């Protein structure tokens, strides 16, 4: 299917549903890039399998993988997880996959954004991203949905929506000169409103400290439900994350969402800080743009979790804050099963569980009134 549409979601009455709305499936991609995943990806692959297995308790999972690694992925993954052959340059499905929109008549369509590996020639993380840029349309073809081609360089991890007209993002990412330098903030807001059918955009200044995506919002905060957000907090005034988190809290505490609500802010602890060890910097192909260094600060965050039907899948790091984060998430989602998955090796690649997943909503999404 995957026929191109020349209108827009707003014009056609489609909106991006929130992550807490019903999902048909979750898509992931197999990690094999040897300049990003040490020892040919074997450590990360084990954690991707664990994440997928956790998700599969409540939601169907589809993996994409190139032809060379198809058998490897198929053998490693449980039988109930679908594996299909679609190549990509790396495995960040949140950023390269389709962003789906739905209407109240049970129809679904897909947005394909432009992708430039988090910065293109200015500060992108790799030199060739043509395969990544083709994933969204191929994904929509498999799910059987028409496609809007949005004229905006945008990664899925740079936005969160509440499903009721509010979008959250960061100035650090969306206004970065490596994304859409020809567009003003107002231009970008207009395009987000047209292609996601949102009414109000709440801008945080920065994302998590040392986040190589230029500060994706999904690594510092998450939408729990309309009017309620979770945010990574920092209590160490000597940590560079401290000022970032306090500034974000100030913005969110003063914000009014699209429905006129003030926001409840649930604070998540910050793990660590965590750093790349000597062993973790070894056994990587050399790369100018993704040169992992011993002692490099890792952008670890419990906010980088996935809501999927009746489960919450969140990253753990072997830190004392893991259990505290689980308790906070369980209180925030009392009717969900909260599943922690050890994800340090995913973190070493530059993201975490939310970054490596992309949900496909049910066609019969909840009607917003």
UniProtKB/Swiss-Prot annotation:
Domain of life: Bacteria
Pfam families linked to this entry: PAD_porph
Record carries keyword Hydrolase: yes
EC numbers on record: 3.5.3.12
Gene3D superfamilies: L-arginine/glycine Amidinotransferase, Chain A
Single annotated GO MF: protein-arginine deiminase activity
UniProt keywords, alphabetically: Hydrolase
EC class of the enzyme, as a word: hydrolase
GO biological processes: putrescine biosynthetic process
Entry annotation: catalytic residues: 355
Catalysed reaction, written as an equation: agmatine + H2O = N-carbamoylputrescine + NH4(+)
InterPro entries with a match to the protein in the record: Agmatine_deiminase (IPR017754), Peptidyl-Arg-deiminase_porph (IPR007466)
Record-given protein name: Putative agmatine deiminase
Organism: Marinomonas sp. (strain MWYL1)
């Amino acid at each position: 299917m995957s026929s191109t549409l020349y209108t827009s979601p707003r014009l056609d009455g489609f909106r991006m549903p929130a992550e807490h709305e019903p999902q048909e499936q979750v898509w992931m991609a197999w990690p094999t890039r040897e300049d990003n995943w040490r020892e040919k990806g074997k450590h990360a692959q084990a954690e991707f399998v664990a994440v997928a297995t956790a998700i599969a308790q409540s939601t169907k999972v589809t993996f994409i993988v190139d032809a060379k690694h198809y058998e490897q992925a198929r053998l490693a993954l449980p039988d109930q997880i679908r594996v299909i052959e679609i190549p990509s340059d790396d495995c960040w499905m949140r950023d390269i996959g389709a962003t789906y929109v739905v209407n109240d008549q049970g129809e679904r369509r897909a947005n394909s954004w432009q992708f430039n590996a988090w910065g293109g020639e200015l500060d992108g993380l790799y030199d060739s991203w043509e395969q990544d840029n083709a994933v969204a349309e191929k994904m929509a073809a498999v799910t059987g949905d028409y496609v809007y081609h949005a004229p905006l360089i945008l990664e899925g991890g740079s936005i969160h929506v509440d499903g009721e007209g509010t979008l959250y993002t960061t100035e650090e990412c969306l206004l970065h000169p490596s994304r859409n330098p020809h567009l003003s903030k107002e231009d970008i807001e207009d395009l987000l409103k047209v292609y996601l059918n949102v009414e109000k955009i709440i801008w945080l200044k920065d994302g998590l400290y040392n986040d190589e995506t230029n500060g994706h919002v999904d690594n510092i905060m998450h939408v729990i439900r309309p009017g309620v957000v979770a945010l990574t907090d920092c209590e160490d005034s000597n940590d560079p994350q401290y000022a970032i988190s306090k500034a974000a809290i100030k913005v969110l505490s003063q914000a009014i969402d699209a429905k006129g609500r003030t926001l409840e802010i649930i604070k998540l602890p910050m793990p660590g800080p965590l750093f790349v060890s000597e062993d973790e910097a070894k056994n990587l192909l050399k790369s100018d743009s993704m040169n992992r260094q011993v002692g490099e600060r890792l952008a670890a965050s419990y906010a980088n979790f996935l809501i999927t039907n009746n489960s919450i899948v969140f990253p753990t790091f072997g830190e004392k804050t893991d259990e505290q984060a689980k308790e906070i998430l369980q209180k925030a989602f009392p009717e969900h099963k909260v599943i922690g998955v050890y994800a340090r090796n995913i973190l070493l690649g530059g993201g975490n569980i939310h970054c490596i997943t992309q949900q496909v909503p049910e066609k019969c999404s909840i009607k917003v009134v």
